[in-house]
Amino acid sequence: MTTIAILGSGIMGSALSVPLADNGHDVRLVGTFLDTEIIASLKATGIHPGLRRKLPESVRAYQLEEVEAAFEGAGIVLSGVNSFGVRWAGQQLARLLKPGMLVIAIAKGMEAAENGDLRILPEVLADEVPEELRSQISWAAIGGPSIAGEVAARRDTCVVFAGRDQAVLDRLAETFRTDHYHVWTSTDFVGVEVCAAMKNCYALSVGFAEGVLERLGESDSIDRIHNYEAALFGQGAVEMGQMLRLQGGRPETAYGLAGVGDMYVTSAGGRNVRVGRLIGAGMTFLEAHAKLGHITLEGAAAIKVIGGALPKLTERGVVEPTDFPLLRALYEVIGKDQPLHIPWGSMFGAEPVPAGTAAPEAGPVPVSEDERAAELAHEPD
């Protein structure tokens, strides 16, 4: 039995307590300063309000002020915060980690330097830990298609554990692997993490299609708009492969679980797709974001960071002006709040051509209360 401390009681970190508990491990779930009500619910009833289900009896809940007790004797630590809280989590871990611990990050995104250089989030997390201690910690991450509600419901889920030490990955896989939680390993740490960030960008773009159909007044038409979706999905896969080469990852990682697998499930629904639909229907990004109540959007954040780095990388000659045409277009829409325009003629390695076809203008489509209140646990992260 291993003692595992999970920092952050959001839906994914909490869902991962299920396979761990099923394997008989001592699981300690610690809330952040934003999770007070979640932990209170778990302590009182065992029910996670986001997942809307009871966690295994062996999972123990701790408020943030109890974090030292939760980390006592832990051998594995899971950083369960999202990309917006990575540096905060690193600062907490800096005082809690001990030499020899294994740390797994689940946040998906990247960080850009002033010159446009991009870094994966586990490296950002580790930066907050003093160098001497950092070198005595093993770092890993989880990629692949994984909806939290399905993990908690023990539905078959296939994921990739990535890191630089194969022996550590083997130990982690054995710790987590169950009959329903299937774990593969990869030493392409950078590649898996780049895919984890970029899949959110392209999943958002796939959401445009349904909105475009609504703008055309053909939502009920027998002729759908899957061709549009598939083209953006395919270009997203191409650009993920290009980014892996640029960052030193293995291009083939883009075409497995961590890349197209994760992008597929994220494109199936959720917040990224909902905001994409509203943009496709005629709203600007800021209008769509406001319509959805300014909810956290990891896809939009990733587009702003990664897409925003491209002009600087282009100026330095690191990438060509014709590279990443879809991501550049997404940055115009999300980062600069410009009208939707898809550069069809510049995609799939084609020579750049003058302006492609923009979707026709029309009024925005309303969002129902049911959509706004969609259960976060049962949509892709």
Regions found by a protein language model. Give the residues of each.
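NAD(P)+-binding Rossmann beta1-loop-alpha1 motif at the extreme N-terminus of oxidoreductases
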Residues: 1-54, 60-62, 113, 124-128, ...
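Residues that mark the start of a beta-strand
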Residues: 2-3, 102, 330
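Short beta-strand/turn micro-motifs composed of small residues
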Residues: 8, 31, 105-107, 143, ...
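Rossmann-like NAD(P)(H) cofactor-binding subdomain of soluble oxidoreductases
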Residues: 61-155, 172
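Internal alpha-helical scaffold of NAD(P)-dependent oxidoreductase catalytic cores
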Residues: 96, 131-138, 156-253
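General beta-strand structural signal in soluble alpha/beta enzymes
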Residues: 105, 137-143, 183-187, 255, ...
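NAD(P)-dependent Rossmann-like dehydrogenase/reductase catalytic/cofactor-binding core
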Residues: 199, 204-214, 223, 230-241, ...
